[in-house]
């Protein structure tokens, strides 16, 4: 929107931001002459008064100058804080001179306004810029690569930023960096930009376009990002603005191609980095977003080019542009009306002519009038987005789901005496515009849910307005009826009863139903309408008729002559007498005795018959020869490919009658493709019927889209109705895979769902989206729909972490050995996606108990941490470790050095000789957790010590799970190991059983590689009983809840030495526990809670560790029922395992499935206790749905998403075995 206008052919410069009022200085341009061809030059200062509605700017002062200017800037040097008129006007002359003016003296009318002047440059000075950090520094550029840095405090001698660039060239642009004060950039018309570092006095980088067509006419630094700048090209062949980042200077970061011809100037707003002005030879002034390339505003200009454009430093919404037509225009990017500009033009005409006759006729003219259009105003819209300095008090917008969102600013008093707080309440309303569309969609959804497809199709047939629409729905309806091919034939006009009557008339017979029955026996099954008595009567008549016809055969009782003459008959007789059927057939064919040839060929065998048939068809040229050929030779593809498309009904009828099921769809598709390629629009629409017969949904969508107008919602509804019904028909009646969704169908379904969502039908839109597809548009739309419903996407978790992260300051030293720390309690150390974990050397803080005899905490998250008392070597994580589930693929983890272990919490523990332990053994998991962003906190959850821990890989494997906890409140003697989940079993199984259950490395997680030995089998004594899990009553004789809370955490055996002695540990309740030897160091549990390790600890001799424990009385453990809403999970998973067991033949696979069935009990326990997060529950239900549809690939993808985004401690006990089950089901195809 134009605000002001100055009729000057001049360069321009705005007063600094500190100055008020706002001034605009103009200096006569040296690049062109004005309309009067005047050689005078002047320097003028205008005041910007926006309260004045006129377009004229008030001229404050004029100074006659002897110079014309190529560049003019107004610097804030020596400007006082009050904002009085001061600063310095710096002008670049045409003879290499730089002149400094005092603007305050110009406004005051003084004659001596020149502060200083230097003629240092060669050629005109086209580039000037003031350093915004040190306003006394001014950079200038001219010809011969001359760049000077001027100090306004010492203007006598300038400095150079470095050696001149070679070859010498003109400097067209120069600009100081907006963030770093010693960085300067210059550009030349050759297209090369150079960045100078004044501290080093040399160029640090040169930027150039590879096309060598960039003629730099503009240069500007990013206001906020120090390494980014834009270059503008004035070449009409490459009218672009290139955005460069000096960190990646090999190619432009972004290219703006909004101008049609070369660009003459650019200006970047200091108030909003997303506003970049540009003007070009296409007579456009554009305001673009350099980050996206979008044009935010186009100023209404005339047809003249603008050669200079600048933002107003004080008012960020105002800009000025100097054009070649001798005008400097001031605009606002906030919009407005141009009626004032039109009125000014009218006033000029009136003042010039008045009411005088310009043609000398002597008659006065009537007053000049213009058409009054009071209802229409020329409104110029503002920017597409609000600038950074503006915040809207009110607003409205349509959101996803057809919701209108409005907000307004309301002042709400909080309390008496308190200041009012402005709140912005948001109002959301639903907008519905397509009611008919929603009604038809609801009817379709009801038909799908109720399986009432025949009734739905019948209603559509009755409501059809065209014959083609009626045929389409009739064909769709036939898919749900019996004898669909016969019904298709009837729709094509081939009714069995009518055909029988016509044949009977042709044979001059009246038993039409009999003939119809004969025909139906050959081509289709009978409709079964006649009664059994009628069928017997017809059969009797047929036998009688055949008997009468046989009476006409010649009698075999007379004599006949066997001629062997030389004619054709004699030769045929000789061939027959010698058994040469082939020659006899050839003679018959030569004599055109076709019937004799066929009869003899039948006697000669199938091969001769086939040859004779081919010869017969080659000679016969009747109208139906090719049809008979196709029937006999069963070559229907030739008929479909070669028939006249006007007979497409007959070709389709033949395919419906004779085609085999495996070739039926392909033949229908082929016929439909031929019809679709025809130029006749009527035939193209008939191709839809062929695709319906073939059940090809994708081709139907493509054909319908070409034939029908799909611009309205109701036309899209017509298509979707047919698509949904046909997909259901194919799914119910044909053995085809209908789960695949093509790109075109996905596009239409997403459009349809988007329309439903736009009308507020979120649930319906989600129901119509195909489930089994990975099309990006459908996946994204499903995600939006699920979020619009307020529930997470199936199988996905929220990206927001529910855990608190404890920051670690850089350079913070780790704890010193021998000293204990008491940090804040935390249950999980979590790093959001994309954030790096602490580097090696930073220790993840854990919970440390300073005294072994202190009472144990009751909360599961407050578990003690015990660390080795002496420094340990830093282990490396293994390059490859096996997945948690048996048979799973190996997951690669790069090797990373791990932080050293934390200090010892038990300073009085004696030192163990290294002889009894392996020096390379990974000690505590604290350091390893510090280097793993997804692992649990070292102080919170130790790795499990159950049989499942064998699959964690070699030494250095990160802790796997904190989910190996027992169900709370379970007491009494546990059931047998085979009845418990794998996480609750003890390690008392024989090594043979363990090897049969597990795959991958058979060593325990704590076995050193050097001691990779297989222990000898030992005969178990009769009174041997396996070590009791922590659910035994001996662990909690009094049933106190304090001990029960600890029972939910597993223990991890540490290094065990057979030579070390340990002080007796006590429980919290004071009950001593007399068990096996306890390891020295373990995480999460005190030594008295450790389970026995029958394998032997690392470094310890593998000996007899079997303990003779007195048998305990067994008690039955009662479990809570699984909630009804989650019972489907147990049913689905168990049913899938049973199906896999029934199909599996490999004993190893069966053992895997048996183990998976037992280990899934842990999932069911968590469902009983309702300890799983809702996102994991939703993901499990998604997996169950994929199992029901037998789409195991989708189930595995959901599984992967759950494992990668959820808390590992929640899922590690059951998700690996669930992956095993899904993988085996996919492999077995159950």
Swiss-Prot record:
Q: Return the WD repeat spans.
A: 4-47, 64-111, 120-160, 166-206, 209-254, 258-298, 301-342, 397-429
Q: Where in the sequence does UniProt note compositional bias of the Pro residues kind?
A: 866-876
Spell out the Polar residues composition-biased ranges. Answer: 981-995, 1033-1064
State the post-translational modifications.
Monoubiquitinated by the BCR(KLHL12) E3 ubiquitin ligase complex, leading to regulate the size of COPII coats.
Where does the record place the modification Asymmetric dimethylarginine? 423
Q: Which spans of this chain does the record mark as coiled coil?
A: none
- GO cellular component annotations of the record: COPII vesicle coat; COPII-coated ER to Golgi transport vesicle; cytosol; endoplasmic reticulum exit site; endoplasmic reticulum membrane; perinuclear region of cytoplasm; vesicle coat
Q: Where is this cross-link: Glycyl lysine isopeptide (Lys-Gly) (interchain with G-Cter in ubiquitin)?
A: 646, 1227
Interaction with SEC13: where is this region? 161-470
Q: Which UniProt keywords apply?
A: Cytoplasm, Cytoplasmic vesicle, Endoplasmic reticulum, ER-Golgi transport, Isopeptide bond, Membrane, Methylation, Phosphoprotein, Protein transport, Repeat, Transport, Ubl conjugation, WD repeat
Q: What are the GO MF terms of this UniProt record? A: calcium-dependent protein binding
GO BP field = COPII-coated vesicle cargo loading; protein transport; response to calcium ion
Q: Where is this motif: ALG-2-binding site motif-2 (ABS-2),?
A: 841-847
Which parts of the sequence are annotated with region: Interaction with PDCD6? 799-1123
Mode of membrane association:
Peripheral membrane protein
Where does the record place the region Disordered? 789-905, 924-1104
Primary site of residence? cytoplasm
- For bias kind Low complexity, which ranges apply? 930-940, 959-975
User: Where found?
Assistant: Cytoplasm; Cytoplasmic vesicle, COPII-coated vesicle membrane; Endoplasmic reticulum membrane
Q: Which residues carry this modification: Phosphoserine?
A: 526, 531, 798, 1173
What is known about what this protein does?
A: Component of the coat protein complex II (COPII) which promotes the formation of transport vesicles from the endoplasmic reticulum (ER). The coat has two main functions, the physical deformation of the endoplasmic reticulum membrane into vesicles and the selection of cargo molecules.
Q: What is known of its domains?
A: The ALG-2-binding site motif-2 (ABS-2) contains a PXPGF sequence that binds hydrophobic pocket 3 of PDCD6.
Family under the similarity heading:
Belongs to the WD repeat SEC31 family.
Subunit details: COPII is composed of at least 5 proteins: the SEC23/24 complex, the SEC13/31 complex and SAR1. SEC13 and SEC31 make a 2:2 tetramer that forms the edge element of the COPII outer coat. The tetramer self-assembles in multiple copies to form the complete polyhedral cage. Interacts (via WD 8) with SEC13. Interacts with PDCD6; interaction takes place in response to cytosolic calcium increase and leads to bridge together the BCR(KLHL12) complex and SEC31A, leading to monoubiquitination. Interacts with KLHL12.
**Protein name listed in UniProt:** Protein transport protein Sec31A
């Amino acid at each position: 929107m134009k605000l002001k206008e100055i009729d000057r052919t001049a360069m321009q410069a705005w007063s600094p931001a500190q100055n008020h009022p706002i001034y605009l200085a103009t200096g006569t341009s040296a690049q062109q002459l004005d309309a009067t061809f005047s050689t005078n030059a002047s320097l003028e200062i205008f005041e910007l008064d926006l309260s004045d509605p006129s377009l004229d700017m008030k001229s404050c002062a004029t100074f006659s100058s002897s110079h014309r200017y190529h560049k003019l800037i107004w610097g804030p040097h020596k400007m006082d804080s009050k904002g009085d008129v001061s600063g310095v006007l710096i002008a670049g002359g045409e003879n290499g001179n730089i002149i400094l003016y005092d603007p305050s003296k110009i406004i005051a009318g003084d004659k001596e306004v020149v502060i200083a002047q230097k003629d240092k440059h060669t050629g005109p000075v086209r580039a000037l810029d003031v350093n915004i950090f040190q306003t006394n520094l001014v950079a200038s550029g001219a010809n011969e690569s001359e760049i000077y840095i001027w100090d306004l405090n010492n203007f006598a001698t300038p400095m150079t930023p470095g050696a001149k660039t070679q070859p010498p060239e003109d400097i067209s642009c120069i600009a100081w960096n907006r963030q770093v004060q010693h960085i300067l950039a210059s550009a030349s018309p050759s297209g090369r930009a150079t960045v100078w570092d004044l501290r080093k006095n040399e160029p640090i980088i040169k930027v150039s376009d590879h096309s060598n067509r960039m003629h730099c006419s503009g240069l500007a630094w990013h206001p906020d990002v120090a390494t980014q700048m834009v270059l503008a090209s004035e070449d009409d062949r490459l009218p672009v603005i290139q955005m460069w980042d000096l960190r990646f200077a090999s190619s432009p970061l972004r290219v703006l191609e909004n101008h049609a011809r070369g660009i003459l100037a650019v200006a970047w707003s200091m108030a909003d980095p997303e506003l970049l002005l540009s003007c070009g030879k296409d007579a456009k002034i554009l305001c673009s977003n350099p980050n996206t390339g979008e044009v935010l505003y186009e100023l209404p200009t005339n047809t003249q080019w603008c050669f200079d454009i600048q933002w107003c430093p004080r008012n960020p919404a105002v800009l000025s542009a100097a054009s070649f037509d001798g005008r400097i225009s001031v605009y606002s990017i906030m919009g407005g009306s141009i009626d004032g500009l039109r009125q000014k033009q009218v006033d000029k005409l009136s003042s010039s002519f008045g009411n005088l006759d310009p043609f000398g006729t002597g008659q006065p003219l009537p007053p000049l009038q213009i058409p009054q259009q009071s209802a229409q105003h020329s409104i110029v819209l503002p920017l597409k987005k609000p600038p950074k300095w503006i915040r809207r008090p009110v607003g409205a917008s349509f959101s996803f789901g057809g919701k209108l969102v409005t907000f307004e600013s309301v002042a709400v008093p909080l309390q008496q005496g308190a200041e009012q707080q402005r709140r912005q309440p948001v109002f959301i309303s639903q907008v519905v515009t397509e009611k008919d569309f929603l009604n038809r969609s609801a009817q379709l959804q009801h038909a799908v849910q109720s399986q009432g497809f025949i009734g739905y199709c019948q209603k559509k047939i009755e409501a059809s307005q065209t014959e083609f629409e009626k045929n389409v729905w009739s064909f769709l309806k036939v898919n749900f009826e019996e004898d669909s091919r016969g019904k298709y034939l009837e729709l094509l006009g081939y009714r069995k009863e009518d055909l029988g009557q016509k044949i009977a008339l042709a044979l001059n017979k009246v038993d039409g139903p009999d003939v119809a029955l004969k025909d139906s026996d050959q081509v289709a099954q009978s409709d079964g309408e006649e009664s059994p008595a009628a069928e017997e009567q017809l059969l009797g008549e047929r036998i009688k008729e055949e008997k009468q016809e046989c009476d006409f055969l010649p009698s075999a009782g007379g004599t006949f002559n066997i001629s062997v003459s030389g004619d054709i008959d004699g030769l045929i007789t000789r061939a027959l007498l010698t058994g040469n059927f082939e020659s006899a057939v050839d003679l018959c064919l030569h004599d055109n005795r076709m019937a004799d040839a066929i009869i003899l060929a039948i006697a000669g065998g199938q091969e001769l018959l086939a040859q004779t048939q081919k010869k017969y068809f080659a000679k016969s040229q009747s109208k139906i020869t090719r049809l008979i050929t196709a029937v006999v030779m069963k070559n229907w593809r030739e008929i479909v490919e070669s028939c006249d498309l006007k007979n497409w009904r007959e070709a389709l009828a033949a395919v419906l009658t004779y085609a085999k099921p495996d070739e039926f769809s392909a033949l229908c598709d082929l016929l439909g493709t031929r019809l679709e390629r025809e130029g006749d629009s009527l035939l193209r629409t008939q191709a839809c019927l062929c695709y319906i017969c073939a059940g090809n949904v994708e081709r139907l969508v493509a054909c319908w889209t070409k034939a029908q107008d799909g611009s309205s919602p109701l036309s899209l509804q017509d298509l979707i109705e047919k698509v949904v019904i046909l997909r259901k028909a194919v799914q119910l009646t044909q053995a085809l895979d209908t789960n695949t969704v093509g790109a075109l169908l996905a596009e239409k379904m997403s459009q349809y769902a988007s329309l439903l969502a736009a009308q507020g039908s979120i649930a319906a839109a989600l129901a119509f989206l195909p489930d089994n597809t990975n099309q990006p548009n459908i996946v994204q739309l499903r995600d939006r729909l699920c979020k619009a419903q307020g529930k997470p996407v199936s199988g996905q978790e929220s990206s927001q972490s529910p855990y608190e992260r404890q920051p670690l300051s850089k350079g913070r030293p780790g704890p010193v050995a021998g000293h204990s720390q008491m940090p804040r309690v935390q249950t999980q150390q979590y790093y959001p996606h994309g954030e790096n974990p602490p580097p090696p050397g930073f220790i993840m803080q854990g919970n440390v108990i300073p005294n072994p005899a202190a009472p144990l905490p009751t909360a599961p998250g407050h578990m003690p941490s015990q660390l080795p008392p002496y420094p340990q070597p830093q282990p490396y994580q293994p390059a490859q470790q096996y997945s948690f589930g048996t048979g799973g693929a190996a997951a690669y983890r790069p090797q990373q050095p791990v932080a050293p272990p934390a200090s010892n919490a038990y300073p009085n523990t004696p030192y163990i000789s290294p002889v009894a332990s392996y020096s390379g053994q990974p000690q505590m998991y604290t350091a390893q957790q510090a280097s793993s962003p997804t692992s649990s906190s070292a102080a919170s959850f130790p790795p499990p010590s159950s049989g499942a821990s064998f699959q964690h890989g070699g030494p250095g494997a990160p802790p796997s799970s904190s989910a190996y906890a027992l169900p709370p409140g379970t007491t009494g003697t546990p059931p047998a190991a085979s009845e418990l989940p794998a996480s609750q079993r003890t390690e008392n199984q024989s090594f043979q059983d363990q090897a049969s259950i597990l795959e991958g490395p058979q060593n325990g997680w704590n076995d050193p590689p050097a001691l990779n030995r297989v222990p000898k089998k030992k005969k178990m004594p009769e009174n041997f009983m396996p070590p009791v899990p922590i659910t035994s009553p001996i662990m909690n004789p009094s049933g106190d809840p304090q001990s029960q809370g600890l029972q939910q955490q597993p223990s991890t055996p540490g290094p065990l030495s057979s030579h070390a002695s340990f002080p007796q540990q006590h429980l919290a309740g004071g009950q001593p526990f007399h068990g096996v030897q306890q390891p020295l160091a373990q995480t999460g549990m005190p030594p008295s809670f450790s389970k026995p390790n029958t394998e032997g600890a690392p470094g310890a001799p593998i000996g007899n560790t079997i303990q003779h424990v007195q048998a305990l009385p067994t008690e039955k453990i009662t479990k809570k029922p699984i909630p009804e809403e989650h019972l489907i999970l147990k049913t689905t998973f168990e049913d899938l395992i049973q199906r896999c067991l029934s199909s599996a033949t490999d004993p190893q696979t069966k053992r895997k499935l048996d183990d998976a069935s037992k280990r899934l009990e842990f999932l069911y326990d968590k469902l009983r206790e309702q300890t799983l997060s809702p996102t994991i529950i939703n993901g499990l239900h998604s997996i169950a749905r994929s199992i029901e549809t037998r789409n195991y690939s989708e189930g595995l993808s959901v599984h992967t998403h759950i494992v990668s985004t959820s808390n590992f401690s929640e899922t590690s006990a059951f998700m690996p075995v669930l992956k095993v089950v899904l993988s085996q089901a996919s492999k077995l195809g159950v």
